[in-house]
Amino acid sequence: MKSLTRRRVLSNAGSIALGVTALGSACGSAFAQVATDKGQGLLAKLQAAKKVRIGFPNQPPFSGLNPDGTVTGAAPTITKAIMERLGIPGIEGILATYGELIPGMLADRWDFVSAALTITKARCSQVRFGDPIIFDGDNIVALKDHPGPMPKRLSELAKGGFVVGAPAGGADVKALLAAGVPLDKIRQFNNDPSEIDALLAKRIDFGVMSPSGVRQIIKQRTIDLEITYPVEDDPPRGSACAFRLQDPDLYEAYVGEMRKMRASGELIAILKSFGYETTIEQLSTPVAQLCARES
């Protein structure tokens, strides 16, 4: 991944005008000094600064970068709409891998995570999740000419001794481990295109990734893939933005505005524009229920 420098970018169709920064380089700004003033909740500080820092991964169509460096994706688009309603027009996007999102937020490298971060029991002990913005399972993906039958379960990947790709630091790695796939048989990638490249180069036998990610790749590239969906031992999960436990004011304001968008149909419309097919019933799944899931 090339190092990104801070810069102003112009909005265009399907993207957002966000400042994009490399991981860890956003901590010494005047804005950071505003955010450390005591006696205010984070929401009030952000409203005074007119700016928020979000951590996000380059994982289209959930969130990512266009070729010109502008930020795009379902989660940042939802965040942009909500922040404008809260009087915070400026958004600084800071690129990170999935595995860096929570540690970076807890270290104050960004104010919250604007991504489709899978809601799990372990993560719920560290952060406060917003309502789900995505409710999706995973695909098992292989090249069409792969030998043998197509696995229907993650446990079959373990029994076959296959080398399997998955998003770096994501819930998929834990799901593979729980299914019995040894860690030395798992290859982690920063994004879905890199995982597909490894599949094409025969560095992995199978990949595990989201249906939305696969659809995005198929739109952009001519690849003959065989896909298992749904995966029998990997049911759909809810994914959401994440907030620090000590920032209830920002969390409550964000979730309140998102629920208004959900009720009006605006949330579903944004998700459809990025290729997601979901229902209000799925997006209304209680976070407490999703937090009970182990992986």
Segments (PLM) and residue ranges:
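N-terminal secretory signal peptides and thylakoid transit peptides that target proteins
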Residues: 1-20
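Extracytoplasmic small-molecule ligand-binding "clamshell" domains
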Residues: 34-116, 125
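Short helix-initiation/N-cap motifs at beta->coil->alpha
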Residues: 92-103, 152, 187-197, 235
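A ligand-binding cleft/hinge motif common to bilobed small-molecule-binding domains
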Residues: 100, 116-125, 177, 205-235
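Periplasmic-binding protein-like
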Residues: 135-139, 219-255, 277-295
